[in-house]
Amino acid sequence: MLTERQLLILQTIIDDFIGSAQPVGSRTLAKKDEITYSSATIRNEMADLEELGFIEKTHSSSGRVPSEKGYRFYVDHLLAPQNLPNDEIVQIKDLFAERIFEAEKIAQQSAQILSELTNYTAIVLGPKLSTNKLKNVQIVPLDRQTAVAIIVTDTGHVQSKTITVPESVDLSDLEKMVNILNEKLSGVPMSELHNKIFKEIVTVLRGYVHNYDSAIKMLDGTFQVPLSEKIYFGGKANMLSQPEFHDIHKVRSLLTMIDNEAEFYDILRHKQVGIQVKIGRENSATAMEDCSLISATYSIGEEQLGTIAILGPTRMQYSRVISLLQLFTRQFTDGLKK
Protein backbone atom coordinates (compact mmCIF):
# COMPACT_ATOMS: atom_id res chain seq x y z
CA MET A 1 0.00 0.00 0.00
CA LEU A 2 1.44 3.35 -1.04
CA THR A 3 1.48 6.29 1.36
CA GLU A 4 -0.25 9.57 0.51
CA ARG A 5 3.18 11.09 -0.16
CA GLN A 6 4.15 8.29 -2.53
CA LEU A 7 0.79 8.55 -4.32
CA LEU A 8 1.30 12.27 -4.89
CA ILE A 9 4.88 11.83 -6.10
CA LEU A 10 3.94 8.96 -8.43
CA GLN A 11 1.02 10.90 -9.91
CA THR A 12 3.18 13.99 -10.40
CA ILE A 13 5.94 11.96 -12.10
CA ILE A 14 3.46 10.36 -14.51
CA ASP A 15 1.61 13.61 -15.26
CA ASP A 16 4.91 15.38 -15.94
CA PHE A 17 6.26 12.59 -18.14
CA ILE A 18 3.02 12.39 -20.15
CA GLY A 19 3.33 16.09 -20.90
CA SER A 20 7.07 16.38 -21.49
CA ALA A 21 8.28 12.93 -22.62
CA GLN A 22 11.37 13.67 -20.51
CA PRO A 23 12.56 11.57 -17.53
CA VAL A 24 11.62 13.20 -14.23
CA GLY A 25 14.19 13.89 -11.50
CA SER A 26 13.89 15.02 -7.89
CA ARG A 27 14.87 18.60 -8.80
CA THR A 28 11.97 18.83 -11.26
CA LEU A 29 9.55 17.51 -8.64
CA ALA A 30 10.84 19.89 -5.96
CA LYS A 31 9.87 22.85 -8.18
CA LYS A 32 6.24 21.72 -8.44
CA ASP A 33 3.77 23.76 -6.37
CA GLU A 34 1.95 20.64 -5.20
CA ILE A 35 5.18 19.04 -3.91
CA THR A 36 6.20 20.57 -0.58
CA TYR A 37 8.81 18.00 0.48
CA SER A 38 12.59 18.41 0.56
CA SER A 39 14.75 17.06 -2.26
CA ALA A 40 16.14 14.40 0.08
CA THR A 41 12.64 13.19 0.99
CA ILE A 42 11.64 13.14 -2.69
CA ARG A 43 14.74 11.10 -3.59
CA ASN A 44 13.99 8.58 -0.84
CA GLU A 45 10.37 8.20 -1.94
CA MET A 46 11.43 7.83 -5.58
CA ALA A 47 13.88 5.11 -4.55
CA ASP A 48 11.05 3.27 -2.79
CA LEU A 49 8.73 3.67 -5.80
CA GLU A 50 11.47 2.29 -8.04
CA GLU A 51 12.02 -0.66 -5.73
CA LEU A 52 8.27 -1.36 -5.80
CA GLY A 53 8.35 -1.33 -9.62
CA PHE A 54 6.23 1.77 -10.27
CA ILE A 55 9.02 3.83 -11.88
CA GLU A 56 12.29 2.89 -13.56
CA LYS A 57 15.62 4.33 -14.70
CA THR A 58 16.46 5.16 -18.28
CA HIS A 59 19.86 4.59 -19.87
CA SER A 60 20.28 8.19 -20.96
CA SER A 61 19.19 10.18 -17.90
CA SER A 62 19.36 10.26 -14.12
CA GLY A 63 15.60 10.87 -14.04
CA ARG A 64 12.86 8.25 -13.78
CA VAL A 65 9.99 7.25 -16.06
CA PRO A 66 6.79 5.33 -15.26
CA SER A 67 6.85 1.56 -15.71
CA GLU A 68 3.91 -0.43 -17.09
CA LYS A 69 3.02 -1.24 -13.49
CA GLY A 70 3.10 2.48 -12.70
CA TYR A 71 0.82 3.35 -15.60
CA ARG A 72 -1.59 0.56 -14.64
CA PHE A 73 -1.79 1.83 -11.05
CA TYR A 74 -2.24 5.39 -12.36
CA VAL A 75 -5.13 4.39 -14.64
CA ASP A 76 -6.83 2.21 -12.03
CA HIS A 77 -6.44 4.44 -8.96
CA LEU A 78 -5.19 7.97 -9.68
CA LEU A 79 -6.98 9.05 -12.84
CA ALA A 80 -9.48 11.91 -12.58
CA PRO A 81 -12.01 12.70 -15.36
CA GLN A 82 -10.93 15.57 -17.59
CA ASN A 83 -13.42 18.22 -18.62
CA LEU A 84 -13.27 18.72 -22.37
CA PRO A 85 -13.16 22.25 -23.87
CA ASN A 86 -16.57 23.51 -25.04
CA ASP A 87 -15.42 23.93 -28.64
CA GLU A 88 -14.45 20.24 -28.80
CA ILE A 89 -17.78 19.17 -27.29
CA VAL A 90 -19.64 21.30 -29.87
CA GLN A 91 -17.52 19.88 -32.72
CA ILE A 92 -18.31 16.31 -31.66
CA LYS A 93 -22.02 16.94 -31.10
CA ASP A 94 -22.30 18.66 -34.49
CA LEU A 95 -21.02 15.49 -36.14
CA PHE A 96 -23.97 13.55 -34.73
CA ALA A 97 -26.60 16.26 -35.25
CA GLU A 98 -27.54 15.46 -38.85
CA ARG A 99 -31.19 14.57 -39.36
CA ILE A 100 -30.38 11.31 -41.12
CA PHE A 101 -27.91 9.26 -39.09
CA GLU A 102 -25.59 7.39 -41.46
CA ALA A 103 -23.56 5.10 -39.20
CA GLU A 104 -20.92 4.37 -41.84
CA LYS A 105 -20.29 8.03 -42.62
CA ILE A 106 -20.26 8.93 -38.91
CA ALA A 107 -17.78 6.13 -38.13
CA GLN A 108 -15.41 7.36 -40.83
CA GLN A 109 -15.62 10.99 -39.68
CA SER A 110 -15.29 9.97 -36.01
CA ALA A 111 -11.96 8.28 -36.72
CA GLN A 112 -10.69 11.40 -38.45
CA ILE A 113 -11.84 13.85 -35.76
CA LEU A 114 -10.54 11.70 -32.89
CA SER A 115 -7.12 11.41 -34.52
CA GLU A 116 -6.98 15.20 -34.92
CA LEU A 117 -8.11 15.90 -31.34
CA THR A 118 -5.63 13.46 -29.78
CA ASN A 119 -2.75 13.32 -32.29
CA TYR A 120 -2.90 9.53 -31.86
CA THR A 121 -4.26 6.84 -34.18
CA ALA A 122 -8.04 6.43 -34.00
CA ILE A 123 -9.80 3.22 -35.03
CA VAL A 124 -13.55 2.76 -35.39
CA LEU A 125 -15.13 -0.63 -35.98
CA GLY A 126 -18.52 0.02 -37.56
CA PRO A 127 -21.69 -1.94 -36.86
CA LYS A 128 -21.81 -5.44 -38.31
CA LEU A 129 -24.44 -5.22 -41.03
CA SER A 130 -25.51 -8.87 -40.77
CA THR A 131 -26.94 -8.22 -37.30
CA ASN A 132 -28.77 -5.08 -38.48
CA LYS A 133 -32.43 -5.22 -39.39
CA LEU A 134 -33.94 -3.59 -42.44
CA LYS A 135 -35.76 -0.37 -41.61
CA ASN A 136 -36.83 0.62 -45.11
CA VAL A 137 -35.82 0.58 -48.75
CA GLN A 138 -36.24 3.28 -51.38
CA ILE A 139 -35.70 3.14 -55.13
CA VAL A 140 -35.24 6.61 -56.62
CA PRO A 141 -35.30 6.83 -60.45
CA LEU A 142 -32.54 8.95 -61.98
CA ASP A 143 -33.65 8.49 -65.57
CA ARG A 144 -35.52 5.86 -67.55
CA GLN A 145 -32.75 3.27 -67.26
CA THR A 146 -31.10 3.92 -63.89
CA ALA A 147 -32.15 4.39 -60.29
CA VAL A 148 -30.55 4.59 -56.85
CA ALA A 149 -31.54 1.91 -54.35
CA ILE A 150 -31.24 3.14 -50.75
CA ILE A 151 -31.29 0.57 -47.95
CA VAL A 152 -31.62 1.89 -44.38
CA THR A 153 -31.13 -0.34 -41.32
CA ASP A 154 -32.32 0.00 -37.74
CA THR A 155 -28.83 1.11 -36.62
CA GLY A 156 -28.71 4.03 -39.05
CA HIS A 157 -26.56 2.30 -41.67
CA VAL A 158 -27.38 3.66 -45.13
CA GLN A 159 -26.32 1.61 -48.14
CA SER A 160 -26.90 3.11 -51.57
CA LYS A 161 -26.11 1.70 -54.99
CA THR A 162 -26.94 2.58 -58.55
CA ILE A 163 -29.00 -0.09 -60.31
CA THR A 164 -30.09 -0.62 -63.89
CA VAL A 165 -33.84 -0.56 -64.43
CA PRO A 166 -34.92 -2.98 -67.19
CA GLU A 167 -36.93 -1.36 -70.00
CA SER A 168 -39.84 -3.65 -69.23
CA VAL A 169 -40.15 -2.37 -65.63
CA ASP A 170 -42.09 0.90 -65.43
CA LEU A 171 -42.36 3.42 -62.60
CA SER A 172 -45.62 2.00 -61.29
CA ASP A 173 -43.94 -1.42 -60.97
CA LEU A 174 -41.08 0.17 -59.02
CA GLU A 175 -43.51 1.84 -56.66
CA LYS A 176 -45.43 -1.40 -56.06
CA MET A 177 -42.19 -3.28 -55.40
CA VAL A 178 -40.97 -0.75 -52.85
CA ASN A 179 -44.31 -0.81 -50.99
CA ILE A 180 -44.31 -4.62 -50.84
CA LEU A 181 -40.67 -4.80 -49.74
CA ASN A 182 -41.20 -2.31 -46.92
CA GLU A 183 -44.39 -4.01 -45.79
CA LYS A 184 -42.95 -7.53 -45.76
CA LEU A 185 -39.26 -7.01 -44.93
CA SER A 186 -39.14 -4.23 -42.34
CA GLY A 187 -37.52 -5.68 -39.20
CA VAL A 188 -35.94 -8.66 -40.99
CA PRO A 189 -32.18 -9.19 -40.25
CA MET A 190 -29.99 -8.22 -43.21
CA SER A 191 -28.41 -11.68 -43.23
CA GLU A 192 -31.84 -13.21 -43.93
CA LEU A 193 -33.04 -10.75 -46.58
CA HIS A 194 -31.88 -12.62 -49.66
CA ASN A 195 -33.53 -15.90 -48.64
CA LYS A 196 -36.72 -14.15 -47.54
CA ILE A 197 -37.02 -12.32 -50.86
CA PHE A 198 -36.60 -15.44 -52.97
CA LYS A 199 -38.67 -17.74 -50.78
CA GLU A 200 -41.57 -15.48 -49.91
CA ILE A 201 -41.56 -12.06 -51.57
CA VAL A 202 -41.30 -13.34 -55.14
CA THR A 203 -44.67 -15.03 -54.77
CA VAL A 204 -46.29 -11.79 -53.63
CA LEU A 205 -44.63 -9.76 -56.40
CA ARG A 206 -45.90 -12.15 -59.06
CA GLY A 207 -49.45 -11.00 -58.37
CA TYR A 208 -48.69 -7.26 -58.51
CA VAL A 209 -45.82 -6.59 -60.90
CA HIS A 210 -46.37 -6.94 -64.64
CA ASN A 211 -42.85 -7.81 -65.75
CA TYR A 212 -42.10 -10.09 -62.87
CA ASP A 213 -38.94 -11.83 -64.17
CA SER A 214 -37.12 -8.57 -64.96
CA ALA A 215 -38.12 -7.08 -61.62
CA ILE A 216 -36.78 -10.08 -59.67
CA LYS A 217 -33.47 -9.93 -61.54
CA MET A 218 -33.14 -6.26 -60.60
CA LEU A 219 -33.93 -7.02 -56.95
CA ASP A 220 -31.26 -9.71 -56.80
CA GLY A 221 -28.55 -7.13 -57.47
CA THR A 222 -30.11 -4.54 -55.19
CA PHE A 223 -29.81 -6.61 -52.01
CA GLN A 224 -26.30 -7.94 -52.53
CA VAL A 225 -24.57 -5.82 -49.86
CA PRO A 226 -21.46 -6.62 -47.75
CA LEU A 227 -22.51 -7.84 -44.30
CA SER A 228 -19.23 -7.77 -42.34
CA GLU A 229 -18.28 -4.75 -40.24
CA LYS A 230 -15.98 -2.11 -41.71
CA ILE A 231 -12.97 -0.66 -39.93
CA TYR A 232 -11.95 2.98 -40.24
CA PHE A 233 -8.62 4.57 -39.31
CA GLY A 234 -7.73 8.17 -38.63
CA GLY A 235 -4.15 9.42 -38.26
CA LYS A 236 -2.36 6.22 -39.28
CA ALA A 237 0.99 8.00 -39.30
CA ASN A 238 0.43 9.98 -36.09
CA MET A 239 2.69 7.62 -34.14
CA LEU A 240 5.66 9.05 -36.03
CA SER A 241 5.09 12.43 -34.35
CA GLN A 242 5.52 10.90 -30.88
CA PRO A 243 9.09 11.30 -29.48
CA GLU A 244 9.37 7.63 -28.46
CA PHE A 245 8.68 6.52 -32.03
CA HIS A 246 11.16 8.71 -33.91
CA ASP A 247 13.30 5.59 -34.44
CA ILE A 248 11.75 4.14 -37.61
CA HIS A 249 13.15 0.67 -36.85
CA LYS A 250 11.28 0.64 -33.55
CA VAL A 251 7.97 1.65 -35.09
CA ARG A 252 8.16 -0.25 -38.40
CA SER A 253 6.29 -3.37 -37.22
CA LEU A 254 3.58 -1.21 -35.64
CA LEU A 255 3.09 0.84 -38.82
CA THR A 256 2.92 -2.39 -40.85
CA MET A 257 0.24 -3.72 -38.50
CA ILE A 258 -1.75 -0.47 -38.74
CA ASP A 259 -1.43 -0.44 -42.52
CA ASN A 260 -2.60 -4.04 -42.90
CA GLU A 261 -5.64 -3.35 -40.67
CA ALA A 262 -6.73 -7.01 -40.45
CA GLU A 263 -5.30 -7.68 -36.98
CA PHE A 264 -7.36 -4.84 -35.56
CA TYR A 265 -10.57 -6.59 -36.63
CA ASP A 266 -9.82 -9.40 -34.19
CA ILE A 267 -8.58 -7.05 -31.46
CA LEU A 268 -11.66 -4.80 -31.56
CA ARG A 269 -14.26 -7.44 -32.36
CA HIS A 270 -14.01 -9.11 -28.98
CA LYS A 271 -13.92 -6.10 -26.69
CA GLN A 272 -15.93 -6.20 -23.48
CA VAL A 273 -18.65 -3.63 -22.90
CA GLY A 274 -17.47 -0.24 -21.62
CA ILE A 275 -14.03 1.40 -21.47
CA GLN A 276 -10.98 -0.85 -21.61
CA VAL A 277 -7.34 0.21 -21.24
CA LYS A 278 -4.54 -2.10 -22.39
CA ILE A 279 -1.04 -0.91 -21.52
CA GLY A 280 2.19 -2.08 -23.17
CA ARG A 281 2.61 -5.84 -22.99
CA GLU A 282 -0.99 -6.27 -21.88
CA ASN A 283 -1.70 -6.01 -25.62
CA SER A 284 -1.66 -9.36 -27.39
CA ALA A 285 0.28 -8.11 -30.43
CA THR A 286 4.05 -7.75 -29.93
CA ALA A 287 4.06 -4.76 -32.30
CA MET A 288 1.97 -2.91 -29.70
CA GLU A 289 4.17 -3.59 -26.66
CA ASP A 290 5.24 0.08 -26.46
CA CYS A 291 1.66 1.30 -26.93
CA SER A 292 -1.54 1.71 -25.01
CA LEU A 293 -4.92 0.95 -26.56
CA ILE A 294 -8.02 2.54 -25.05
CA SER A 295 -11.29 1.21 -26.43
CA ALA A 296 -14.97 1.85 -25.83
CA THR A 297 -18.00 -0.01 -27.14
CA TYR A 298 -21.24 1.53 -28.37
CA SER A 299 -24.51 -0.34 -28.28
CA ILE A 300 -28.29 -0.29 -28.25
CA GLY A 301 -29.60 -1.90 -25.07
CA GLU A 302 -27.81 -5.21 -24.62
CA GLU A 303 -26.66 -5.39 -28.24
CA GLN A 304 -23.03 -4.34 -28.73
CA LEU A 305 -22.73 -2.82 -32.19
CA GLY A 306 -19.17 -1.55 -32.56
CA THR A 307 -15.99 -0.26 -30.98
CA ILE A 308 -14.07 3.02 -30.96
CA ALA A 309 -10.40 2.88 -29.97
CA ILE A 310 -7.36 5.13 -29.60
CA LEU A 311 -3.85 3.76 -30.11
CA GLY A 312 -0.99 5.80 -28.69
CA PRO A 313 2.26 5.51 -26.74
CA THR A 314 2.14 4.22 -23.16
CA ARG A 315 2.83 7.88 -22.34
CA MET A 316 -0.74 8.64 -23.36
CA GLN A 317 -3.08 11.37 -22.11
CA TYR A 318 -5.30 8.74 -20.51
CA SER A 319 -7.79 11.04 -18.82
CA ARG A 320 -8.40 13.15 -21.93
CA VAL A 321 -8.71 10.14 -24.24
CA ILE A 322 -11.17 8.38 -21.92
CA SER A 323 -13.32 11.53 -21.70
CA LEU A 324 -13.34 11.83 -25.50
CA LEU A 325 -14.28 8.18 -25.98
CA GLN A 326 -17.06 8.42 -23.41
CA LEU A 327 -18.54 11.41 -25.26
CA PHE A 328 -18.21 9.74 -28.67
CA THR A 329 -19.80 6.45 -27.59
CA ARG A 330 -22.64 8.30 -25.84
CA GLN A 331 -23.32 10.34 -28.98
CA PHE A 332 -23.00 7.27 -31.22
CA THR A 333 -25.44 5.27 -29.09
CA ASP A 334 -27.94 8.16 -29.01
CA GLY A 335 -27.63 8.56 -32.78
CA LEU A 336 -28.36 4.88 -33.39
CA LYS A 337 -31.56 5.21 -31.38
CA LYS A 338 -32.92 7.99 -33.62
UniProtKB/Swiss-Prot annotation:
**UniProt cross-references to Pfam families, sorted A to Z:** HrcA
- What InterPro entries does the annotation carry? GAF-like_dom_sf, HrcA, HrcA_C, WH-like_DNA-bd_sf, WH_DNA-bd_sf, WHTH_transcript_rep_HrcA_IDD
Q: Which cysteines are joined by disulfide bonds?
A: none
Query: What UniProt keywords are attached to this protein's entry?
Result: Repressor, Stress response, Transcription, Transcription regulation
Q: Name one GO molecular function term.
A: DNA binding
A biological process term (GO) from this entry: negative regulation of DNA-templated transcription
Q: Which domain of life is it from?
A: Bacteria
NCBIfam families in alphabetical order? hrcA
Q: What does this protein do?
A: Negative regulator of class I heat shock genes (grpE-dnaK-dnaJ and groELS operons). Prevents heat-shock induction of these operons.
Q: So what family is this one in? A: Belongs to the HrcA family.
Its protein name is Heat-inducible transcription repressor HrcA
- Could you tell me which species this protein originates from? Bacillus cereus (strain AH820)
From the broadest rank down, the organism's phylogenetic lineage runs: Bacteria, Bacillati, Bacillota, Bacilli, Bacillales
Its gene name is hrcA
